[in-house]
Each structure stands twice: as C-alpha cells, then as structure tokens.
C-alpha cells in the first residue's frame, strides 16, 4: 500500500512538473510566433526572435516545437492566426485583460466567456477595463552572474532611452515607452547585457486585493485561462491576499 502511495506521489509531482513545463513551452511558442510575425522568421535579421530562441534553448524546448512556431508565423499549413484582446471582470469586480492568439475567434471567445462565467466573473465589451491599464515597454535583466550594481544599471538604462527602473533581488526591471522598447533593447544588448524579457505589455494603474472568500474562485479563473492554448497573456489589476496562492 505504501509503495502504491509513494508511486502515486511521485507520479503526481511528475504530472505537475510536466504541466508547468508545458505552460512554459506554450508561452515561449507564442513569443516565438509573435517575434517572427513582427520581424520575420530569420533570427539573423530579427533581434527579438534571437532573444526568444535563446530563451527556448535555455528552457530545453524541443527543436520541433520551435520549428512549429516559426512555421505558423510563416503561414505554413495554411492556418491564419490573429491577436485578439478580451476584457472582463473577475470575482469581486477585479479587472482582467486576456490577450489571445487564435485561428478561430468563435472558439476562443466562447471558451474565455465560459471561464469568466464559471468562476463568478463576466466578459465585458471592448474598452470596459482597458482604461485601467497602461501599455509600457518592459525589459528584464536577471542579476544572477551579472557584475553590475544598481546605479550603473540605472545609468545605462536611462542612456539607452528607458523611463524608469525597478530593482528586485533577482532582476532589474526596466520600463520604457512602448514604441521605444526595441531601441532600448538594442542599445542595452550593444552594451553587453543579456536580456531575459523585452516586450510591450499592459500594467494596471492600480490594484485591488481579492477578498479572501473569493481568492480560490479568482485563482480558478486565472488557472483556467492559463490552461487555454489560445491565451498568450493575462493582465490583472488584482492581488491575492497575503498567504494565498
């Protein structure tokens, strides 16, 4: 009995690790697609694609997964994908934006609407919550193995055209005008920095704490959205209560 229980626990951990790895590969695939779609499928002439391919290799993403994402961006196979943003409210009225990459708008809209409804939220019309967010360029440089202090990093970021920088134990987070993120990225790479992230994304102007009684329901909504293969990003104007994950 104990042997079965041990196997069950090991299998459970493996399944959880596989699911986490699958989500990472899913996110990288979308980033590869978007980079290739915007700047072409040749990494030699597309710095953003080179960055995403480096991340894919660092995550040990299979070569066939990388090729599939690039083929999709090049139109191989005939399917046409488009980017769509959905806006809605989670439990307790928390604002959420969902970015999707889909070849079937009806399928994606139905799945996202169902997720909101199932977890006590509601899908809104275009513009219903986007005014609560600001679009910014976002660059992340990991501090591990980086021999640069905060002051030097800030000066280099500002010289490259950044607007602001936040320092955490693990990373320097650099913010730019969304139209400048590519130029700032290139300038920092020319200075020798290795970037973990360089993209334009949405940031909430303010955040609301989810009531503890709604936290499980809220997390269920986010989990279901993250599990949707069409969803590329989720932007939240909410934080969970301390101690709740």
From Swiss-Prot:
Alphabetized GO MF terms: DNA binding
- In which broad location class does this protein mainly occur, judging by the first location in its UniProt entry? cytoplasm
| Listed GO biological process terms | regulation of DNA-templated transcription
Q: Which Gene3D superfamilies match?
A: 1.10.10.200, 3.30.70.980
Question: Which UniProt keywords are listed?
Answer: Cytoplasm, DNA-binding, Transcription, Transcription regulation
Keyword Mitochondrion belongs to the record: no
Name the domain of life. Answer: Bacteria
- Transcription regulation as a keyword of this entry, yes or no, is yes
Region Disordered, as annotated, extends over 1-23
Location comes to: Cytoplasm
Q: Name one GO cellular component term.
A: cytosol
Tell me the disulfide pairings in this chain. none
Q: Cite the NCBIfam families for this sequence.
A: PRK00110.1 (NF001030), PRK12378.1 (NF009044), YebC/PmpR family DNA-binding transcriptional regulator (TIGR01033)
Q: Give the family per the record.
A: Belongs to the TACO1 family.
What is the name attached to this protein's record?
A: Probable transcriptional regulatory protein LVIS_1199
Source organism per entry reads Levilactobacillus brevis (strain ATCC 367 / BCRC 12310 / CIP 105137 / JCM 1170 / LMG 11437 / NCIMB 947 / NCTC 947)
Instruction: List the taxonomic lineage.
Output: Bacteria, Bacillati, Bacillota, Bacilli, Lactobacillales
């Amino acid at each position: 009995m104990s042997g079965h229980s041990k196997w069950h626990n090991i299998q459970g951990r493996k399944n959880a690790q596989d699911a986490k790895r699958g989500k990472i590969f899913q996110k990288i695939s979308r980033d590869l697609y978007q980079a290739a779609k915007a700047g072409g499928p040749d990494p030699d002439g597309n710095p953003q694609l080179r960055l995403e391919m480096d991340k894919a290799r660092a995550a040990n993403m299979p070569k066939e997964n990388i090729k599939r994402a690039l083929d999709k961006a090049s139109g191989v196979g005939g399917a046409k994908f488009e980017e769509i943003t959905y806006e809605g409210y989670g439990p307790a009225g928390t604002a959420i934006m969902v970015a999707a990459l889909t070849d079937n708008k009806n399928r994606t809209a139905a799945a996202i609407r169902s997720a909101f409804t199932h977890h006590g939220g509601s899908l809104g019309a275009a513009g219903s919550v986007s005014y609560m967010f600001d679009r910014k360029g976002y660059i992340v440089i990991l501090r591990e193995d980086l021999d640069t202090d905060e002051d030097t990093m800030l000066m280099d970021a500002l010289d490259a055209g950044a607007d602001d920088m936040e320092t955490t134990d693990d990373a320097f987070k650099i913010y730019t005008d969304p139209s400048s993120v590519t130029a700032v990225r290139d300038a920092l790479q020319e200075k020798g920095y290795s970037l973990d992230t360089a993209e334009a994304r949405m940031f909430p102007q303010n955040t609301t704490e989810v009531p503890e009684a709604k936290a499980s329901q809220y997390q269920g909504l986010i989990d279901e959205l993250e599990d949707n293969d069409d969803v590329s990003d989720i932007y939240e104007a909410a934080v969970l209560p301390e101690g709740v994950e």
